[in-house]
Structure formats: structure tokens, C-alpha cells
């Protein structure tokens, strides 16, 4: 279970997908999910810009920026690459100033471009990745004034409101006695995606995936999001629908 307003790290087993309790389960540690960019790629010869080897290429960084995959079948022969999830730098983003956040964002973009070049050009890269990414370049007609990269990094999780209600793990699972998720009289939305977290820290427990990864596809059910979770406890006439009041697992 996740304490309200705190991060509850669990480990996800490769073989059985069972939860493996961590040594400090239930204690907050300040970690959030890894970030990345959603680069738009294409194999269209008339609309692709192949990535050259970055001047600051770092093989270790290229290999570390792993995870994720393609969102296929976008219009105009494009895919969205939801990968390059470098684990660790994101934890300094929520409390960082604008200069810190800009530096972290640049590190993620650099790492993704390094990884793309490595997967396409290094024979030591896994054959599966070389085949998957062969021929893909940045879409020339996407973000042409920003070197064809999105303007913003994909911030999965950062600073959040602690509001009049904290939406948490228990709101996403079957409640005792009613065979459904908890009912909120002030519900304003219904969740659709299962409880899901990408990696949070670059470490692995024995027999486990990277720290923080979980996907509770079987346990999660559609849940009601109460109006109170977007209301502050102190400020009137303010709604916070994006950075709403929720725990990490919520």
C-alpha cells in the first residue's frame, strides 16, 4: 500500500510479475518516475533527418537511456519513440530551479540522440535494436525551429498538490464489500489506464526489474477521481487538474 503523499517503491519480478518487498517499503525517498522525450521519427526519405554522431557522444549514457518503445501508425508514416528513459537525473527536476531543469532536459535529449545513433551505427548494439531502428530519422516537419525535437521534456511526475483529498492506490483497486473501486460523491472523472510506473532509481534488487517499475494491469480497475483532489486546502478559486493531489502509486 502507498502512504498518502509518499513514494512507496516496490520491485517487479521479471519471471512472475509478483511484488517483491523492498527493504524500506512504505517510506518516502523523494524519487519520481524517469523522464524522456517523445521524439517523432520517420523512415520517409523525403521527410527524415538522420542523426549524426553527437560531438559529446558517451557510450555509457547511450546504453543507459533505454526502455520504452514505439507508438506506431502516426499520420504521414511517423512513429513516436517513447524511449530513452535515463534513470536518475529526473529526481533533481521537481525541486530544481529553471537552470537546473534546463540542464536535466538537455541531458535527456542528448542521451536519446546518442542512443539513436548508437543503435543505428554500432555493430555491438543488439541486433534486435539495430533492426527496429534502422532507417529512422527525425521527422523534418516536426518542430523545425527546435532541431526537430519537442519543446518540452516528458515530465511523468514532479511536484504535486496536497489537496483536500489524496488520490491513492486504494482508489484504483476493488474495495471491500462493494466489488468495485471506492465511490466518491464528488467524482469528476474516471481513470482508464492501470497503475503504472517506470523506473525511479538506477538499481536492481536480485531477480527484479529496475527499482520502481510496476504495471498493475490485473489489480487495477476504473476509478473515480474526486473533485477534492484538484482543490487546495488554502487558496480559493484555484483548480489543479494536472498536478493534482495524488500519491505516487495513485
Which residues are covered by each model-predicted region?
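Flavin (FAD/FMN)-binding glycine-rich loop and adjacent Rossmann-like elements that form
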Residues: 1-249
Amino acid at each position: 500500500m502507498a502512504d498518502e503523499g509518499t513514494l512507496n517503491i516496490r520491485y517487479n519480478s521479471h519471471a512472475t510479475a509478483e511484488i517483491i518487498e523492498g527493504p524500506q517499503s512504505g517510506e518516502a525517498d523523494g524519487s519520481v518516475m524517469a523522464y524522456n522525450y517523445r521524439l517523432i521519427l520517420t523512415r520517409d526519405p523525403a521527410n527524415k533527418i538522420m542523426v549524426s554522431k553527437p560531438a559529446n557522444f558517451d557510450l555509457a549514457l547511450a546504453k543507459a537511456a533505454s526502455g520504452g518503445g514505439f507508438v506506431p501508425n502516426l499520420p504521414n508514416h511517423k512513429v513516436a519513440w517513447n524511449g530513452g528513459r535515463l534513470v536518475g537525473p529526473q529526481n533533481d527536476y521537481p525541486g530544481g530551479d529553471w537552470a537546473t531543469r534546463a540542464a536535466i532536459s538537455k541531458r535527456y535529449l542528448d542521451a536519446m540522440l546518442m542512443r539513436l545513433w548508437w543503435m543505428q551505427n554500432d555493430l555491438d548494439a543488439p541486433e534486435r535494436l539495430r533492426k527496429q531502428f534502422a532507417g529512422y530519422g527525425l521527422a523534418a516537419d516536426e518542430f523545425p525551429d527546435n532541431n526537430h525535437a519537442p519543446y518540452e521534456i516528458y515530465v511523468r511526475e514532479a511536484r504535486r498538490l496536497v489537496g483536500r483529498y489524496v488520490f491513492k492506490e486504494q482508489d484504483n483497486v476493488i474495495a471491500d464489500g462493494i466489488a468495485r473501486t471506492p465511490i466518491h460523491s464528488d467524482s469528476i472523472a474516471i481513470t482508464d489506464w492501470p497503475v503504472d510506473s517506470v523506473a525511479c532509481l538506477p538499481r536492481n534488487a536480485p531477480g527484479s526489474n529496475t527499482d520502481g517499475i510496476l504495471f498493475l494491469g490485473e489489480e487495477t480497475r476504473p476509478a473515480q477521481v474526486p473533485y477534492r483532489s484538484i482543490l487546495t486546502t488554502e487558496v480559493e478559486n484555484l483548480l489543479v487538474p494536472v498536478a493534482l493531489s495524488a500519491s505516487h502509486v495513485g
